[in-house]
């Protein structure tokens, strides 16, 4: 995904079972962040930082969506435990993750693995990166 590219229309289903589309955010800016795993230290810190600045970001016109390959049930527990005020998309088939180019090789302490690459996109009012 490059600057200026359009984000796919269908984003996926969140922890409450709601299906999200880019058209739901027409005319709004979106922080679309991808994270590897619910309830892990780094992912929890990232989500809580966005939670802690949620009001400020909304005042600037941003909506927030988190995405990982975890299940909706896992997202529901994570969102409840951390009091997250934004949707978490359960991309279990990795359709959005792969379309956005955030699945690939990563080096973890000298060991090459394949997984979700922690990435954040700022999406403009027209649905472009």
Describe the residue ranges of each PLM region.
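Chalcogenol-based redox active-site neighborhoods
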Residues: 1-129
């Amino acid at each position: 995904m490059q600057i200026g590219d359009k984000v796919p229309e269908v984003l996926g289903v969140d922890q409450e079972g709601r299906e999200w589309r880019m058209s739901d955010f027409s005319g709004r800016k979106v922080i679309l962040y991808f994270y590897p795993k619910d309830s892990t230290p780094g992912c929890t810190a990232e989500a809580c930082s966005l939670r802690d600045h949620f009001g400020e970001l909304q005042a600037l016109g941003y909506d927030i969506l988190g995405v990982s390959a975890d299940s909706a049930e896992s997202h529901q527990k994570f969102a409840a435990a951390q009091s997250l005020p934004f949707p978490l998309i359960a991309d279990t088939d990795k359709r959005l993750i792969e379309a956005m180019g955030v699945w690939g090789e990563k080096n973890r302490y000298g060991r090459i693995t394949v997984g979700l690459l922690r990435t954040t996109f700022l999406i403009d009012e027209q649905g472009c990166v």
